[in-house]
Each structure stands twice: as C-alpha cells, then as structure tokens.
Amino acid sequence: ADLKDVDVAYVLNLINFHSVDFTGKASGKAIIKSLFNDPDAYAQLDVKEFTFENGPLGVLHAGVNFNKELEQIDIHAVADDGPEHQTLINGYVSPKRNYIDLGIDAQGTSMKFLENFCGSFMNQVEAWGNGYLNVVGDLKNINLVGDITAHGKVHLKQLNTDYTFDALHAHAIPDDILIENDTIFDRNRNIAILSGGIHHKHLTRLSYDLDIKAHNFLGFDTREFGDNTFYGTIYATGEVGIHGKSGETVIDINAEPEPGSLLE
C-alpha cells in the first residue's frame, strides 16, 4: 500500500501504544502479506514533522519490518534535522512480549522535548545532545537508560533567567535522570554548579530535585511585579534548591545578594 501523510499518532493509538508520544505525517510504501498463516510485513517510510514528546526532530526515514523468527517489529531509522543534527534509532517493539528496546544514538539531537517533562519550571529550551540512550522495558513500564552530554540554553520561568551550558552530562537510570556537579552559566558567564535529578515513574508522573551552588550568579531577573510582590535583578552567592512536580514548584534560597543587585 502507498501511504500519504498518515497521522503517526493515530496509528499508535490504533495499536494502543501510549508509553511515549510520537507525532508526524508518514508517507511511503507498506507491504503486508499473509500466506498460509505465514505473515510478513515491511515498510519504508518518511515521516515529516516528526516529534518526540512535542519536541521536533526533523524528518524521520524509517525501515520497519516484521521479524517472523522473533515475532517482533524491527525498526531502523534516522531522524534528520540537518547535517549536524541526526538521531539514529535502532531496535524493536514486541507486541507479543509487550516489550520495547530502542537504541537512540544522539548526534546533535534537539532537547526541546524536555519542555514536555519539565514545563512547570523550564521553557525556551534551545539545546542539543550527543550520546546513547535506550528506551527499554515492558510497554506499560517503559524506561530510559544511558548517557547524554548537552550544550545550549534553557529559561527558568519563575526566576526569568536564561542559563547556558557547554557540556552538561545527564546519566539516565531506571526512573531517574541524574546530574552531578555540572557547570552552568548566567548571561555574564558567571558560574554555578548544578546537581540533582529528574524522577519519573516509567516516563510519567515526573518530579525533580535540583540543587544549585552559586557564586555571584544571576538568580532572579524580572522587570515587573507579575504574580510577585517584588521585582528586580539579584546576583547571589549561596545555594538554591528547585523541587517540584507537574504544576507545582518550590524554590528554596539560602544565599546572600551581591553588589549590583536591585529589588523593588
């Protein structure tokens, strides 16, 4: 069958795959044969506007085939978001065993999908990662393991600050994504040390505990009251904890303001 702009989310809904969200418009050729109870199926697809958890990853070029011997769907794909932004995906999904194992080789992969997980305190993610991750586990208890190193910037909503990082290392283990003593920078390239983790239950019910040790670091920068009773710019030395879950963020500050700070 020739496919033209088929909604990927619709297809995943048909096979009851809701572990993580993929979207896009798939075109290409799919062949399904069943001779004397000997099923065979394969497809060569191009998926435009391919996204993972609302994060754009470019155009996905995917070869998919039914592995009769192992009774699983083998997937070999590349998400092409430009010459320096490639994501290689190789692995399988087994509906019979209710299991997934997808290896993800990130080569300048966009980290925009983090907004879907950390949107209660973070947005405007402009970051890219390199490393290797596995999406693996029972389809109802999916997990993420591996390591990735990222560069770019994020915006912390409650603080109204942009922070950049040159080589932030994240280590994913079951139900946790860990960061240990990594350097982040404010707009003046002042340094703070970030540690902590993003916790999840099979990539759902996310929560987070992040700790920042700062020296003369931009910790708050607003130009109007908004929801606060104050506004201003604060450079601080000390410690900041960011804790929370979806829809709820608590920021604990134990820091001294530095010269140049202004609060109205």
Give the label of every model feature segment:
Residues 1-132, 140-239, 243-264:
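Interface amphipathic segments
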